[in-house]
Amino acid sequence: MGALSEIFTAGYVALAGITGFFLVFLGFLVVISDYIDGWRSRRALGDIPIVDEGSNLSPILRWNSQPYDAEAEFTRAYYKYSKNGKPFAARIQHGGYAIVLPPSACRKVRSIGHEQLSFLDALAEFADLSLHMDVTSRRVIEATHACNNETTIKNFQERLALECGKHLAPVFDPPQEQESTELKTLKSVFAAISAVATALILGPDCPEALVSEVTAGATAYNEVMIQCRILRAQYPKILKPLVWRFSRTARELRAILSRLKARLVPEIKRRIAYLEAHSTSENQAESAGSFSLLDILIQTSFKNRHLPSTPVENDKWADLLCQQALLYHFKLSRAPGTSVTFMLYRVMNHPEYATMLRDEMIAALKPSGGNWTADILQRAPKLESFNKETFRMHDISNFVGLRVAMRPVDLRSVSPPLHLKPGTMIMTPSRTVHYDAEHYVDPLTFNGLRFYDATSNTCTPRVFTTSPTYLPFSHGTGSCPARNFATQIARMLFIRLLMGYEFELANEEMPAYGLMDGTAYFPNPEVRMRVRVRGK
Protein backbone atom coordinates (compact mmCIF):
# COMPACT_ATOMS: atom_id res chain seq x y z
CA MET A 1 0.00 0.00 0.00
CA GLY A 2 2.86 2.34 0.84
CA ALA A 3 4.52 1.65 -2.50
CA LEU A 4 1.27 2.41 -4.34
CA SER A 5 0.91 5.67 -2.42
CA GLU A 6 4.43 6.66 -3.36
CA ILE A 7 3.69 5.92 -7.01
CA PHE A 8 0.56 8.14 -6.94
CA THR A 9 2.48 10.89 -5.14
CA ALA A 10 5.26 10.76 -7.69
CA GLY A 11 2.67 10.86 -10.48
CA TYR A 12 0.98 13.95 -9.03
CA VAL A 13 4.33 15.68 -8.62
CA ALA A 14 5.26 14.87 -12.21
CA LEU A 15 1.86 16.07 -13.48
CA ALA A 16 2.16 19.29 -11.47
CA GLY A 17 5.65 19.81 -12.84
CA ILE A 18 4.53 19.27 -16.43
CA THR A 19 1.51 21.56 -15.92
CA GLY A 20 3.72 24.25 -14.41
CA PHE A 21 6.17 23.94 -17.27
CA PHE A 22 3.42 24.36 -19.87
CA LEU A 23 1.94 27.36 -18.04
CA VAL A 24 5.34 29.03 -17.92
CA PHE A 25 5.90 28.13 -21.56
CA LEU A 26 2.50 29.54 -22.58
CA GLY A 27 3.20 32.71 -20.60
CA PHE A 28 6.54 33.01 -22.35
CA LEU A 29 4.81 32.60 -25.75
CA VAL A 30 2.27 35.29 -24.87
CA VAL A 31 5.00 37.77 -23.90
CA ILE A 32 7.11 36.98 -26.98
CA SER A 33 4.15 37.18 -29.39
CA ASP A 34 3.03 40.47 -27.82
CA TYR A 35 6.53 41.91 -28.11
CA ILE A 36 6.73 40.86 -31.78
CA ASP A 37 3.29 42.40 -32.50
CA GLY A 38 4.40 45.66 -30.91
CA TRP A 39 7.71 45.62 -32.76
CA ARG A 40 5.97 44.99 -36.10
CA SER A 41 3.48 47.81 -35.49
CA ARG A 42 6.27 50.26 -34.75
CA ARG A 43 8.44 49.01 -37.60
CA ALA A 44 5.55 49.47 -40.07
CA LEU A 45 5.67 53.21 -39.36
CA GLY A 46 9.13 53.45 -40.91
CA ASP A 47 10.86 56.75 -40.22
CA ILE A 48 7.76 58.44 -38.78
CA PRO A 49 8.50 59.57 -35.18
CA ILE A 50 6.46 57.70 -32.57
CA VAL A 51 5.02 59.47 -29.54
CA ASP A 52 4.08 56.89 -26.90
CA GLU A 53 5.33 55.13 -23.77
CA GLY A 54 8.23 53.61 -25.71
CA SER A 55 7.25 49.99 -25.12
CA ASN A 56 6.52 47.13 -27.52
CA LEU A 57 4.38 45.40 -24.89
CA SER A 58 0.69 45.71 -24.04
CA PRO A 59 -0.13 47.74 -20.91
CA ILE A 60 -0.76 44.70 -18.71
CA LEU A 61 2.77 43.43 -19.43
CA ARG A 62 4.57 46.73 -18.77
CA TRP A 63 5.69 45.82 -15.27
CA ASN A 64 8.28 48.58 -14.97
CA SER A 65 6.52 51.29 -16.96
CA GLN A 66 7.34 54.90 -16.12
CA PRO A 67 4.73 57.67 -15.63
CA TYR A 68 3.65 59.01 -19.01
CA ASP A 69 2.03 62.43 -19.49
CA ALA A 70 0.23 61.89 -22.81
CA GLU A 71 -1.09 65.44 -23.15
CA ALA A 72 2.33 67.01 -22.54
CA GLU A 73 3.94 64.65 -25.06
CA PHE A 74 1.26 65.36 -27.69
CA THR A 75 1.73 69.10 -27.18
CA ARG A 76 5.49 68.75 -27.58
CA ALA A 77 5.02 66.69 -30.76
CA TYR A 78 2.60 69.26 -32.19
CA TYR A 79 5.16 72.06 -31.96
CA LYS A 80 8.08 69.87 -33.01
CA TYR A 81 6.45 68.04 -35.93
CA SER A 82 2.95 69.28 -36.86
CA LYS A 83 3.86 72.97 -36.92
CA ASN A 84 6.74 72.13 -39.24
CA GLY A 85 4.60 70.13 -41.66
CA LYS A 86 5.81 66.72 -40.45
CA PRO A 87 3.71 63.70 -39.40
CA PHE A 88 4.16 61.68 -36.23
CA ALA A 89 2.46 58.57 -34.88
CA ALA A 90 0.50 58.14 -31.64
CA ARG A 91 -1.01 55.17 -29.89
CA ILE A 92 -4.82 55.33 -29.79
CA GLN A 93 -7.55 53.69 -27.72
CA HIS A 94 -7.41 50.16 -29.12
CA GLY A 95 -3.64 49.96 -28.58
CA GLY A 96 -2.60 50.40 -32.21
CA TYR A 97 -1.10 53.44 -33.91
CA ALA A 98 -2.45 56.22 -36.07
CA ILE A 99 -0.39 58.64 -38.14
CA VAL A 100 -0.99 62.24 -37.06
CA LEU A 101 -0.98 64.40 -40.18
CA PRO A 102 0.10 68.05 -39.92
CA PRO A 103 -2.72 70.61 -40.35
CA SER A 104 -1.10 71.82 -43.57
CA ALA A 105 -1.85 68.45 -45.19
CA CYS A 106 -5.44 68.16 -44.03
CA ARG A 107 -7.21 70.10 -46.76
CA LYS A 108 -6.31 67.51 -49.38
CA VAL A 109 -7.07 64.58 -47.08
CA ARG A 110 -10.53 65.90 -46.20
CA SER A 111 -11.49 65.85 -49.88
CA ILE A 112 -10.83 62.10 -50.21
CA GLY A 113 -14.03 60.02 -50.21
CA HIS A 114 -15.04 57.43 -47.63
CA GLU A 115 -14.44 54.64 -50.16
CA GLN A 116 -10.70 55.31 -49.73
CA LEU A 117 -10.50 56.75 -46.22
CA SER A 118 -13.32 55.55 -43.97
CA PHE A 119 -14.29 57.02 -40.61
CA LEU A 120 -16.89 54.34 -39.80
CA ASP A 121 -14.46 51.47 -40.32
CA ALA A 122 -11.89 53.31 -38.19
CA LEU A 123 -14.52 53.82 -35.48
CA ALA A 124 -15.35 50.11 -35.48
CA GLU A 125 -11.69 49.25 -34.93
CA PHE A 126 -10.34 51.88 -32.57
CA ALA A 127 -13.43 51.86 -30.30
CA ASP A 128 -13.56 48.04 -30.41
CA LEU A 129 -17.19 48.05 -31.61
CA SER A 130 -17.09 45.41 -34.34
CA LEU A 131 -17.55 42.55 -31.85
CA HIS A 132 -21.05 43.67 -30.86
CA MET A 133 -22.20 46.44 -33.21
CA ASP A 134 -22.13 47.09 -36.96
CA VAL A 135 -21.22 50.75 -37.30
CA THR A 136 -19.93 50.56 -40.87
CA SER A 137 -23.35 51.03 -42.50
CA ARG A 138 -23.87 54.61 -43.65
CA ARG A 139 -27.60 54.63 -42.87
CA VAL A 140 -27.19 56.66 -39.69
CA ILE A 141 -25.22 59.27 -41.65
CA GLU A 142 -27.84 59.23 -44.43
CA ALA A 143 -30.63 59.65 -41.88
CA THR A 144 -28.81 62.53 -40.19
CA HIS A 145 -28.32 64.29 -43.51
CA ALA A 146 -32.04 63.76 -44.20
CA CYS A 147 -32.78 65.75 -41.01
CA ASN A 148 -30.90 68.81 -42.24
CA ASN A 149 -33.94 70.70 -43.45
CA GLU A 150 -35.86 73.55 -41.87
CA THR A 151 -39.01 71.58 -41.02
CA THR A 152 -37.28 68.64 -39.37
CA ILE A 153 -34.89 70.86 -37.40
CA LYS A 154 -37.82 72.95 -36.11
CA ASN A 155 -39.69 69.82 -35.02
CA PHE A 156 -36.54 68.50 -33.38
CA GLN A 157 -36.11 71.78 -31.47
CA GLU A 158 -39.70 71.73 -30.21
CA ARG A 159 -39.42 68.12 -29.11
CA LEU A 160 -36.05 68.80 -27.46
CA ALA A 161 -37.46 71.68 -25.40
CA LEU A 162 -40.31 69.47 -24.16
CA GLU A 163 -38.15 66.45 -23.35
CA CYS A 164 -35.46 68.43 -21.51
CA GLY A 165 -38.11 69.92 -19.23
CA LYS A 166 -39.58 66.48 -18.60
CA HIS A 167 -36.49 64.47 -17.65
CA LEU A 168 -34.62 66.75 -15.23
CA ALA A 169 -36.74 66.49 -12.08
CA PRO A 170 -36.38 62.69 -11.62
CA VAL A 171 -32.60 63.09 -11.56
CA PHE A 172 -31.91 66.47 -9.97
CA ASP A 173 -34.82 67.25 -7.62
CA PRO A 174 -33.85 66.71 -3.95
CA PRO A 175 -35.79 64.07 -2.01
CA GLN A 176 -38.95 65.30 -0.26
CA GLU A 177 -38.38 67.38 2.87
CA GLN A 178 -34.78 68.08 1.85
CA GLU A 179 -33.61 71.45 0.58
CA SER A 180 -30.70 70.06 -1.41
CA THR A 181 -29.11 66.84 -2.61
CA GLU A 182 -25.53 65.87 -3.36
CA LEU A 183 -24.89 64.23 -6.73
CA LYS A 184 -21.98 63.09 -8.86
CA THR A 185 -22.09 65.59 -11.69
CA LEU A 186 -21.08 63.39 -14.63
CA LYS A 187 -23.28 60.45 -13.63
CA SER A 188 -26.32 62.69 -13.11
CA VAL A 189 -25.91 64.53 -16.40
CA PHE A 190 -25.55 61.26 -18.31
CA ALA A 191 -28.71 59.91 -16.62
CA ALA A 192 -30.76 62.93 -17.71
CA ILE A 193 -29.35 63.26 -21.21
CA SER A 194 -29.74 59.54 -21.83
CA ALA A 195 -33.47 59.85 -21.15
CA VAL A 196 -33.69 62.83 -23.52
CA ALA A 197 -31.80 60.97 -26.27
CA THR A 198 -34.07 57.91 -25.94
CA ALA A 199 -37.18 60.08 -26.17
CA LEU A 200 -35.87 61.81 -29.31
CA ILE A 201 -35.08 58.45 -30.92
CA LEU A 202 -38.27 56.57 -30.03
CA GLY A 203 -40.66 59.52 -30.21
CA PRO A 204 -43.59 60.63 -28.02
CA ASP A 205 -45.93 57.80 -29.09
CA CYS A 206 -43.69 55.10 -27.63
CA PRO A 207 -44.97 53.57 -24.35
CA GLU A 208 -43.34 55.11 -21.27
CA ALA A 209 -42.37 51.69 -19.94
CA LEU A 210 -40.39 50.94 -23.10
CA VAL A 211 -38.74 54.38 -23.05
CA SER A 212 -37.66 53.89 -19.43
CA GLU A 213 -36.36 50.38 -20.07
CA VAL A 214 -34.42 51.40 -23.17
CA THR A 215 -32.99 54.44 -21.37
CA ALA A 216 -31.68 52.31 -18.52
CA GLY A 217 -30.34 49.67 -20.91
CA ALA A 218 -28.71 52.12 -23.31
CA THR A 219 -27.08 54.03 -20.44
CA ALA A 220 -25.61 50.80 -19.08
CA TYR A 221 -24.61 49.69 -22.57
CA ASN A 222 -22.72 52.93 -23.24
CA GLU A 223 -20.86 52.67 -19.94
CA VAL A 224 -19.98 48.97 -20.10
CA MET A 225 -19.02 49.27 -23.79
CA ILE A 226 -16.30 51.76 -22.83
CA GLN A 227 -15.19 49.60 -19.90
CA CYS A 228 -14.91 46.58 -22.19
CA ARG A 229 -12.85 48.54 -24.71
CA ILE A 230 -10.50 49.74 -21.98
CA LEU A 231 -10.17 46.20 -20.60
CA ARG A 232 -9.39 44.56 -23.96
CA ALA A 233 -6.88 47.30 -24.81
CA GLN A 234 -4.79 46.23 -21.82
CA TYR A 235 -4.17 42.72 -23.16
CA PRO A 236 -1.96 41.24 -25.89
CA LYS A 237 -3.59 40.62 -29.25
CA ILE A 238 -3.39 36.85 -28.76
CA LEU A 239 -5.46 37.06 -25.54
CA LYS A 240 -8.12 39.57 -26.64
CA PRO A 241 -10.54 36.90 -27.97
CA LEU A 242 -10.37 35.18 -24.57
CA VAL A 243 -11.05 38.47 -22.77
CA TRP A 244 -14.11 38.99 -24.99
CA ARG A 245 -15.31 35.44 -24.41
CA PHE A 246 -14.74 35.01 -20.68
CA SER A 247 -14.33 38.36 -18.90
CA ARG A 248 -17.17 39.47 -16.64
CA THR A 249 -17.29 42.89 -18.32
CA ALA A 250 -17.71 41.41 -21.81
CA ARG A 251 -20.36 38.96 -20.60
CA GLU A 252 -22.24 41.83 -18.99
CA LEU A 253 -22.05 43.82 -22.23
CA ARG A 254 -23.47 40.92 -24.25
CA ALA A 255 -26.26 40.41 -21.71
CA ILE A 256 -27.24 44.10 -21.77
CA LEU A 257 -27.27 44.11 -25.57
CA SER A 258 -29.37 40.94 -25.67
CA ARG A 259 -31.99 42.48 -23.35
CA LEU A 260 -32.06 45.70 -25.36
CA LYS A 261 -32.59 43.84 -28.62
CA ALA A 262 -35.35 41.74 -27.06
CA ARG A 263 -37.26 44.98 -26.34
CA LEU A 264 -36.28 47.13 -29.30
CA VAL A 265 -36.36 44.74 -32.26
CA PRO A 266 -40.11 43.94 -31.96
CA GLU A 267 -40.85 47.68 -31.75
CA ILE A 268 -38.72 48.30 -34.83
CA LYS A 269 -40.51 45.54 -36.77
CA ARG A 270 -43.86 47.04 -35.76
CA ARG A 271 -42.81 50.45 -37.05
CA ILE A 272 -41.45 49.01 -40.29
CA ALA A 273 -44.79 47.30 -40.94
CA TYR A 274 -46.72 50.45 -40.06
CA LEU A 275 -44.63 52.77 -42.21
CA GLU A 276 -44.75 50.33 -45.12
CA ALA A 277 -48.53 50.12 -44.90
CA HIS A 278 -49.24 53.85 -44.78
CA SER A 279 -48.78 56.01 -47.82
CA THR A 280 -48.24 59.03 -45.54
CA SER A 281 -45.18 57.43 -43.99
CA GLU A 282 -42.89 60.15 -45.27
CA ASN A 283 -44.80 62.66 -43.13
CA GLN A 284 -44.76 60.65 -39.93
CA ALA A 285 -41.76 62.50 -38.53
CA GLU A 286 -42.74 65.88 -39.93
CA SER A 287 -44.40 67.25 -36.81
CA ALA A 288 -43.05 67.81 -33.34
CA GLY A 289 -45.88 65.74 -31.92
CA SER A 290 -44.63 62.62 -33.69
CA PHE A 291 -40.92 63.37 -34.12
CA SER A 292 -38.82 60.19 -33.97
CA LEU A 293 -35.26 59.72 -35.17
CA LEU A 294 -35.90 55.99 -35.39
CA ASP A 295 -38.76 56.59 -37.84
CA ILE A 296 -36.51 58.86 -39.88
CA LEU A 297 -33.86 56.13 -39.92
CA ILE A 298 -36.42 53.61 -41.22
CA GLN A 299 -37.79 56.04 -43.80
CA THR A 300 -34.30 56.79 -45.05
CA SER A 301 -33.81 53.07 -45.64
CA PHE A 302 -37.06 53.05 -47.63
CA LYS A 303 -35.95 55.96 -49.78
CA ASN A 304 -32.53 54.47 -50.42
CA ARG A 305 -34.04 51.05 -51.19
CA HIS A 306 -32.33 49.24 -48.32
CA LEU A 307 -35.31 46.86 -48.16
CA PRO A 308 -35.36 43.18 -47.15
CA SER A 309 -37.02 40.65 -49.43
CA THR A 310 -37.27 37.59 -47.13
CA PRO A 311 -38.22 37.00 -43.46
CA VAL A 312 -34.58 36.20 -42.65
CA GLU A 313 -33.41 39.43 -44.26
CA ASN A 314 -36.18 41.29 -42.42
CA ASP A 315 -34.88 39.96 -39.09
CA LYS A 316 -31.33 40.99 -39.98
CA TRP A 317 -32.55 44.42 -41.08
CA ALA A 318 -34.44 45.01 -37.83
CA ASP A 319 -31.39 43.88 -35.85
CA LEU A 320 -29.16 46.29 -37.80
CA LEU A 321 -31.61 49.15 -37.26
CA CYS A 322 -31.55 48.35 -33.53
CA GLN A 323 -27.75 48.60 -33.50
CA GLN A 324 -27.90 51.89 -35.40
CA ALA A 325 -30.50 53.28 -33.00
CA LEU A 326 -28.11 52.45 -30.14
CA LEU A 327 -25.29 54.18 -32.03
CA TYR A 328 -27.59 57.21 -32.39
CA HIS A 329 -28.16 57.13 -28.64
CA PHE A 330 -24.43 57.01 -27.94
CA LYS A 331 -23.72 59.97 -30.21
CA LEU A 332 -26.64 62.08 -28.92
CA SER A 333 -25.87 61.45 -25.26
CA ARG A 334 -22.12 61.03 -24.70
CA ALA A 335 -20.64 64.06 -26.50
CA PRO A 336 -23.42 66.51 -25.48
CA GLY A 337 -23.42 65.07 -21.95
CA THR A 338 -19.68 65.60 -21.72
CA SER A 339 -20.11 69.22 -22.83
CA VAL A 340 -22.92 69.84 -20.30
CA THR A 341 -20.75 68.39 -17.53
CA PHE A 342 -17.82 70.65 -18.36
CA MET A 343 -20.16 73.67 -18.51
CA LEU A 344 -21.46 72.83 -15.04
CA TYR A 345 -17.88 72.56 -13.77
CA ARG A 346 -17.25 76.04 -15.16
CA VAL A 347 -20.30 77.71 -13.59
CA MET A 348 -19.62 76.03 -10.22
CA ASN A 349 -16.05 77.34 -10.35
CA HIS A 350 -17.09 80.74 -11.75
CA PRO A 351 -20.63 81.62 -10.55
CA GLU A 352 -20.58 84.91 -12.45
CA TYR A 353 -21.22 82.97 -15.64
CA ALA A 354 -24.39 81.47 -14.15
CA THR A 355 -25.74 84.94 -13.39
CA MET A 356 -24.94 86.23 -16.88
CA LEU A 357 -26.50 83.26 -18.68
CA ARG A 358 -29.64 83.29 -16.52
CA ASP A 359 -30.16 86.98 -17.21
CA GLU A 360 -29.82 86.36 -20.94
CA MET A 361 -32.32 83.50 -20.86
CA ILE A 362 -34.85 85.49 -18.82
CA ALA A 363 -34.77 88.13 -21.57
CA ALA A 364 -34.98 85.44 -24.29
CA LEU A 365 -38.09 83.90 -22.69
CA LYS A 366 -40.05 87.17 -22.49
CA PRO A 367 -41.25 87.29 -26.15
CA SER A 368 -42.82 83.84 -25.76
CA GLY A 369 -44.37 84.53 -22.37
CA GLY A 370 -41.93 82.24 -20.60
CA ASN A 371 -42.53 79.28 -22.93
CA TRP A 372 -39.58 77.23 -24.20
CA THR A 373 -40.21 77.61 -27.91
CA ALA A 374 -38.29 76.05 -30.80
CA ASP A 375 -36.31 79.22 -31.49
CA ILE A 376 -35.33 79.99 -27.90
CA LEU A 377 -31.67 79.02 -28.38
CA GLN A 378 -31.35 81.47 -31.28
CA ARG A 379 -32.06 84.28 -28.81
CA ALA A 380 -29.19 83.26 -26.51
CA PRO A 381 -25.88 84.09 -28.27
CA LYS A 382 -23.94 84.36 -24.99
CA LEU A 383 -25.00 80.83 -24.11
CA GLU A 384 -23.85 79.69 -27.54
CA SER A 385 -20.48 81.39 -27.10
CA PHE A 386 -20.12 79.81 -23.65
CA ASN A 387 -20.89 76.39 -25.14
CA LYS A 388 -18.48 76.92 -28.04
CA GLU A 389 -15.67 77.93 -25.70
CA THR A 390 -16.36 74.79 -23.66
CA PHE A 391 -16.01 72.66 -26.79
CA ARG A 392 -12.76 74.49 -27.62
CA MET A 393 -11.21 74.14 -24.17
CA HIS A 394 -12.55 70.68 -23.37
CA ASP A 395 -12.48 68.80 -26.65
CA ILE A 396 -13.08 65.10 -25.96
CA SER A 397 -9.96 64.05 -27.87
CA ASN A 398 -6.50 65.32 -28.66
CA PHE A 399 -7.11 64.34 -32.28
CA VAL A 400 -9.94 64.35 -34.83
CA GLY A 401 -10.46 63.24 -38.40
CA LEU A 402 -9.75 59.58 -37.65
CA ARG A 403 -9.80 57.56 -40.88
CA VAL A 404 -8.59 54.15 -41.99
CA ALA A 405 -7.26 53.48 -45.48
CA MET A 406 -9.55 51.03 -47.29
CA ARG A 407 -7.21 50.86 -50.30
CA PRO A 408 -3.73 52.19 -51.07
CA VAL A 409 -3.63 56.00 -50.81
CA ASP A 410 -0.78 58.34 -51.72
CA LEU A 411 -0.67 61.60 -49.77
CA ARG A 412 1.50 64.05 -51.66
CA SER A 413 0.42 66.97 -49.47
CA VAL A 414 2.86 65.66 -46.84
CA SER A 415 6.62 66.09 -47.21
CA PRO A 416 7.98 63.57 -47.90
CA PRO A 417 4.87 61.97 -49.49
CA LEU A 418 3.17 59.20 -47.52
CA HIS A 419 1.96 55.91 -48.95
CA LEU A 420 -0.88 54.52 -46.84
CA LYS A 421 -1.40 50.79 -47.00
CA PRO A 422 -4.89 49.38 -46.37
CA GLY A 423 -5.53 49.32 -42.63
CA THR A 424 -3.37 52.38 -41.88
CA MET A 425 -5.09 54.90 -39.62
CA ILE A 426 -4.66 58.65 -39.85
CA MET A 427 -5.87 61.59 -37.78
CA THR A 428 -5.08 65.28 -37.19
CA PRO A 429 -4.38 67.41 -34.09
CA SER A 430 -7.29 69.24 -32.48
CA ARG A 431 -6.73 70.12 -28.82
CA THR A 432 -3.24 71.46 -29.48
CA VAL A 433 -4.67 73.53 -32.35
CA HIS A 434 -7.25 74.97 -29.95
CA TYR A 435 -4.48 75.83 -27.47
CA ASP A 436 -2.22 77.45 -30.09
CA ALA A 437 -1.59 81.16 -29.47
CA GLU A 438 -1.39 81.72 -33.23
CA HIS A 439 -5.09 80.87 -33.43
CA TYR A 440 -6.56 82.26 -30.20
CA VAL A 441 -5.66 85.09 -27.84
CA ASP A 442 -4.69 83.75 -24.41
CA PRO A 443 -5.76 80.25 -25.50
CA LEU A 444 -5.25 78.52 -22.13
CA THR A 445 -7.72 80.84 -20.38
CA PHE A 446 -11.43 80.04 -20.52
CA ASN A 447 -13.36 83.03 -21.89
CA GLY A 448 -17.07 82.31 -22.10
CA LEU A 449 -17.65 85.37 -24.31
CA ARG A 450 -14.74 84.69 -26.66
CA PHE A 451 -17.08 84.15 -29.61
CA TYR A 452 -19.75 86.69 -28.62
CA ASP A 453 -20.03 89.74 -30.89
CA ALA A 454 -21.65 92.50 -28.84
CA THR A 455 -22.18 94.70 -31.90
CA SER A 456 -24.40 92.19 -33.70
CA ASN A 457 -25.47 90.30 -30.54
CA THR A 458 -24.47 87.00 -32.13
CA CYS A 459 -22.11 84.10 -31.58
CA THR A 460 -19.62 84.39 -34.41
CA PRO A 461 -18.92 81.92 -35.91
CA ARG A 462 -21.74 79.60 -34.77
CA VAL A 463 -21.00 76.76 -32.35
CA PHE A 464 -21.56 74.11 -35.04
CA THR A 465 -19.47 75.92 -37.68
CA THR A 466 -16.19 74.10 -38.14
CA SER A 467 -12.91 75.59 -39.35
CA PRO A 468 -9.22 74.59 -39.53
CA THR A 469 -8.80 76.14 -36.06
CA TYR A 470 -12.07 74.95 -34.46
CA LEU A 471 -12.17 71.17 -34.63
CA PRO A 472 -14.35 69.48 -31.98
CA PHE A 473 -16.47 68.11 -34.83
CA SER A 474 -13.58 67.78 -37.29
CA HIS A 475 -13.75 69.88 -40.46
CA GLY A 476 -14.56 69.59 -44.14
CA THR A 477 -16.46 66.74 -45.78
CA GLY A 478 -15.71 64.47 -42.83
CA SER A 479 -17.15 66.75 -40.14
CA CYS A 480 -19.74 65.26 -37.79
CA PRO A 481 -23.16 65.36 -39.51
CA ALA A 482 -24.98 65.36 -36.14
CA ARG A 483 -23.15 68.40 -34.73
CA ASN A 484 -26.21 70.67 -35.09
CA PHE A 485 -28.31 68.27 -33.04
CA ALA A 486 -25.53 67.61 -30.52
CA THR A 487 -24.84 71.29 -29.80
CA GLN A 488 -28.55 72.07 -29.42
CA ILE A 489 -29.04 69.18 -27.00
CA ALA A 490 -26.07 70.38 -24.93
CA ARG A 491 -27.25 73.99 -24.77
CA MET A 492 -30.91 73.18 -24.09
CA LEU A 493 -30.20 70.69 -21.31
CA PHE A 494 -27.62 72.95 -19.69
CA ILE A 495 -29.75 76.09 -19.69
CA ARG A 496 -32.81 74.20 -18.43
CA LEU A 497 -30.63 72.96 -15.57
CA LEU A 498 -29.29 76.44 -14.91
CA MET A 499 -32.76 78.01 -14.90
CA GLY A 500 -34.27 75.31 -12.70
CA TYR A 501 -31.54 74.65 -10.15
CA GLU A 502 -28.77 76.19 -8.08
CA PHE A 503 -25.45 74.37 -8.16
CA GLU A 504 -22.44 74.55 -5.89
CA LEU A 505 -19.31 72.45 -5.63
CA ALA A 506 -19.55 69.71 -2.99
CA ASN A 507 -15.84 68.83 -3.07
CA GLU A 508 -13.57 70.77 -0.73
CA GLU A 509 -11.87 72.24 -3.79
CA MET A 510 -12.36 71.85 -7.53
CA PRO A 511 -10.52 68.74 -8.76
CA ALA A 512 -9.01 68.56 -12.23
CA TYR A 513 -11.80 69.08 -14.76
CA GLY A 514 -10.81 66.16 -16.98
CA LEU A 515 -8.78 62.96 -17.20
CA MET A 516 -6.83 61.49 -20.12
CA ASP A 517 -7.38 57.98 -21.50
CA GLY A 518 -4.88 57.53 -24.31
CA THR A 519 -5.85 60.21 -26.81
CA ALA A 520 -9.32 60.73 -25.26
CA TYR A 521 -10.29 63.30 -22.63
CA PHE A 522 -13.21 62.74 -20.23
CA PRO A 523 -14.80 64.77 -17.43
CA ASN A 524 -13.52 63.87 -13.99
CA PRO A 525 -16.23 61.56 -12.56
CA GLU A 526 -15.33 62.46 -8.96
CA VAL A 527 -16.61 66.05 -9.13
CA ARG A 528 -19.70 66.29 -6.92
CA MET A 529 -22.28 69.04 -6.72
CA ARG A 530 -24.88 70.20 -4.22
CA VAL A 531 -28.18 70.86 -5.99
CA ARG A 532 -31.34 72.65 -4.91
CA VAL A 533 -34.40 73.77 -6.81
CA ARG A 534 -34.34 77.50 -7.56
CA GLY A 535 -36.97 79.62 -5.87
CA LYS A 536 -37.42 77.26 -2.92
Curated annotation (Swiss-Prot):
Its EC number is 1.14.-.-. One of its GO terms (molecular function) is heme binding. The gene is desC. GO terms for biological process: secondary metabolic process. It is a single-pass membrane protein. Pathway: Secondary metabolite biosynthesis. This is Bicoumarin synthase desC. It comes from the Eukaryota. Keywords: Glycoprotein, Heme, Iron, Membrane, Metal-binding, Monooxygenase, Oxidoreductase, Transmembrane, Transmembrane helix. It catalyses: 2 7-demethylsiderin + NADPH + O2 = desertorin A + NADP(+) + 2 H2O. Non-reducing polyketide synthase; part of the gene cluster that mediates the biosynthesis of the bicoumarin desertorin. The non-reducing polyketide synthase desS first catalyzes the formation of the pentaketidic 4,7-dihydroxy-5-methylcoumarin from acetyl coenzyme A and 4 malonyl coenzyme A molecules. Further O-methylation by desB leads to the formation of 7-demethylsiderin. Then, an oxidative phenol coupling catalyzed by the cytochrome P450 monooxygenase desC forms the 6,8'-dimer M-desertorin A via dimerization the monomeric precursor, 7-demethylsiderin. Belongs to the cytochrome P450 family. It is found in: Membrane. The keyword Cytoplasm does not apply. Its main location: membrane. The chain crosses the membrane at residues 12-32. Its cofactor is heme. It is an enzyme of class 1 (oxidoreductase). The keyword Transmembrane helix applies. Glycans are attached at N149, N371. SUPFAM superfamilies: Cytochrome P450. One of its GO terms (cellular component) is membrane. Heme binds at C480.
